[in-house]
Amino acid sequence: MTEASESCVRDPSNYRDRSADWYAFYDERRRKEIIDIIDEHPEIVEEHAANPFGYRKHPSPYLQRVHNYFRMQPTFGKYYIYSEREWDAYRIATIREFGELPELGDERFKTEEEAMHAVFLRRIEDVRAELA
């Protein structure tokens, strides 16, 4: 038997996918990078508060990097805006596993923009907490 054939995976069920290990490694590096960006450029928090939808003015490169990181996160556990009454009352909800109802936060917001910025701030807090 040749050396190449001995190292082949014959039964895929015996193969452990190591991509999760690398994802965790690089995700921790990205979290540190994101917090460094926020600490070195605190003006991006004010920029987001003034324009949470991003349609008034194109976001700065630093804010774009933070947004890109938040958007690439797994769906379960993400925050979204729940509208209690259209154009009037908004809350933050958390996406949960299939078949589970979303978890609604207690805090209420008058505008969707206020709620969007609150989600942004909460995501920053979560990243800081994960690094602590």
UniProtKB/Swiss-Prot annotation:
It is an enzyme of class 3 (hydrolase). Keywords: Hydrolase. Activity is slightly inhibited by Mg(2+) and Mn(2+), and slightly increased by Cu(2+). Activity is slightly inhibited by the chelating agents 8-hydroxyquinoline, ethylenediaminetetraacetate, o-phenanthroline and 2,2'-bipyridyl. Optimum temperature is 50-55 degrees Celsius. Stable up to 50 degrees Celsius, inactivated after incubation at 60 degrees Celsius for 30 minutes. Activity decreases below 50 degrees Celsius, with 20% of activity retained at 25 degrees Celsius. Its EC number is 3.5.1.56. It catalyses: N,N-dimethylformamide + H2O = dimethylamine + formate. Hydrolyzes N,N-dimethylformamide, and to a lesser extent N,N-dimethylacetamide and N,N-diethylacetamide. Has no activity against the substituted amides N-methylformamide, N-ethylformamide, N-ethylformamide and N-methylacetamide or the unsubstituted amides formamide, nicotinamide, acetoamide, benzamide, acetamide and acrylamide. GO terms for molecular function: N,N-dimethylformamidase activity. Optimum pH is 6.0-7.0. The keyword Hydrolase applies. This is N,N-dimethylformamidase alpha subunit. The keyword Hydrolase applies. Heterotetramer of two DmfA1 (alpha) and two DmfA2 (beta) subunits.
